[in-house]
Amino acid sequence: MSSAATNHPFSVPRYPSGQTCPAASEHLLVTQGAGQEERDALAAQLGKVRITHLALPDFPSVADLQLVLSTTLKDARVGLRLDLRGDEAFVWPLHALARAAGLLADEIFMSSSPEGTRLVFCVHCATCQPATSAGHLTCTQCGVMLEVRRHFSQRLGAYLGVCADADQPYQGVQP
């Protein structure tokens, strides 16, 4: 057994590509962008399986999309496969909504790119905030300079942000 640290920590999500579930009786595709190419590719892979597509640009807000998704999942039957595509700040709240609606983790496929927005949880004030993939940021709530750790909470859908310098937690912040 090697004592070397792994390059990819266990808690950091991995997003496999191209995995469809041909055994599913219905697919629900939710995309952050228009997603027409993704829908067409999925339809080509699955053949005659029913695909419902919800695209964020078709809704006035993320909250409206979440409401429609929640209603759709409430009426869902066994055999549904949920496919979420977008950045981490988009897919993880939808993942939580789907889990709360009763879907199992194996019934949810997520695809995300590391370049998009992600959520960071500040351990000092318990605020979840959108952030880029940068390693440091200033908390929007408490003003502490945070180091973003390579630890991801699936429950929160966020990375852990801790004080970057305990000796000067408010460096760069003007009183």
UniProtKB/Swiss-Prot annotation:
InterPro entries named in the record: DmmA-like_C
Function: Component of the heme-dependent oxidative N-demethylase (HODM) enzyme, that catalyzes the NADPH-dependent oxidation of dimethylamine (DMA) to methylamine (MA) and formaldehyde. Functions in bacterial methylated amine catabolism, linking alkylamine oxidation to the tetrahydrofolate C1 pool. The function of the delta subunit is unknown.
Assembly behavior: The heme-dependent oxidative N-demethylase (HODM) is a heterotetramer composed of a catalytic alpha subunit, a FMN/2Fe-2S-dependent oxidoreductase beta subunit, a gamma subunit with putative aminotransferase activity, and a delta subunit of unknown function.
Protein name stated in the entry: Heme-dependent oxidative N-demethylase delta subunit
